[in-house]
Design a protein with these regions (language model features):
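Phosphate-group recognition and catalysis centered on beta-loop-alpha active-site segments
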Residues: 1-312
């Protein structure tokens, strides 16, 4: 079980124990806790994972949007490797199906934006795609020029045991085996407890549940209007952050579902979403996401302790 120090502080604060000696004892206890947390942080820092301890404070997860796409070409192995180094909780990625049935990781159904080739993914074989330059559009660095479009299997082979996945299915009439292919790879790599399959296409989510009801699904919405909360075959909602308020968060949680918000690249907005209690922040910059999560909960802890100790 996780220890949520902020919750302990809040619970004790509510009891309002006012005896001066008791307050001093509590202050000493919390000082010891803060000292222990700082020691834990420094130990983790030596392991090159300075954000590992964030989960002690918060349930809000960080999802690296198309990998760490702030610093590397989106949906490439380099972006995914950087997301792992940033200790993101999830990688959010997009999948399409090639003409010969290979599942590749790319956002657009057309290759032009990231490779310069003006052709649809589903009209090309994997052999025609695998050597395309998928990184030079991002910058002139040699490491970018080496980036290629990976297969989902290649990604899973690398990420298994390192990070969880949010796999967004971009379904079209020209990709008949995409859903089944994704489900098969989740089964092959035993990823069902470590991933969400998300889509704007509700049909894709129902098909995933028909194949394996234990695979968690997320419905992607641009807005938070209407009676969408009780939709079947959906375990989470992924919604544009500009439509999120506390009522939306509470309504979704009341129905036992998760809430992911996208795409947030400034710390102030990220901290605001964390304060509302969203379950995951999707961001191009996972380091910022981790910092925002930690900052919000460390501020809350300090405020609770100071309020309790020094209140008249």
């Amino acid at each position: 079980n996780k220890l949520y120090i902020g919750e302990i502080a809040e619970d004790i604060t509510e009891k309002r124990i006012r005896h001066p000696l008791t307050q001093k004892v509590i202050a000493i206890i919390f000082s010891a806790i803060l000292f222990t947390v700082n020691i834990f942080y420094m130990v983790k820092a030596f392991d090159n994972n300075p954000f590992n301890y964030v989960e002690m404070f918060s349930d809000t997860l960080t999802m690296a949007h198309r990998g760490s796409s702030y610093e590397a070409p989106e949906n490439t192995m380099l972006a995914f490797e950087n997301a792992v180094k940033a200790t993101a909780d999830y990688i959010e990625l997009d999948v399409h199906e090639t003409k010969d049935g290979e599942i590749v990781v790319i956002h657009d159904d057309n290759l032009k934006r990231t490779t310069g080739v003006n052709k649809k993914v589903y009209n090309m074989t994997y052999d025609e795609i695998k050597d395309l330059d998928a990184g030079s559009y991002f910058g002139d660095e040699e490491e970018f020029k080496k980036c290629r479009i990976p297969t989902l299997e290649e990604v899973m082979s690398y990420t298994k045991g390192k990070i969880k996945l949010n796999i967004e299915i971009k379904l079209s009439a020209y990709e008949p085996d995409l859903v089944e292919g994704v489900a098969a790879l989740i089964e092959k790599y035993d990823y069902k407890d470590e991933c969400y399959v998300t889509s704007m296409n509700y049909k894709a989510l129902t098909e995933i549940k028909e194949i394996n009801e234990e695979i968690k699904t997320g419905y992607i919405l641009y807005s938070a209007y209407g009676n969408y909360y009780n939709i079947d075959n959906v375990d989470a909602f992924s919604i544009n952050f500009s439509y999120i308020n506390k009522n939306v968060v509470d309504a979704i949680h009341y129905r036992g579902k998760q809430l992911f918000v996208w795409t947030i690249n400034d710390r102030k907005t990220a901290e605001k979403m964390v304060a509302m209690g969203v379950d995951a922040v999707i961001t191009d910059n996972p380091v910022m996401g981790k910092e925002a999560t930690y900052a919000r909960y460390s501020y809350s802890l300090i405020e609770n302790v100071l309020s309790y100790v020094f209140e008249d």
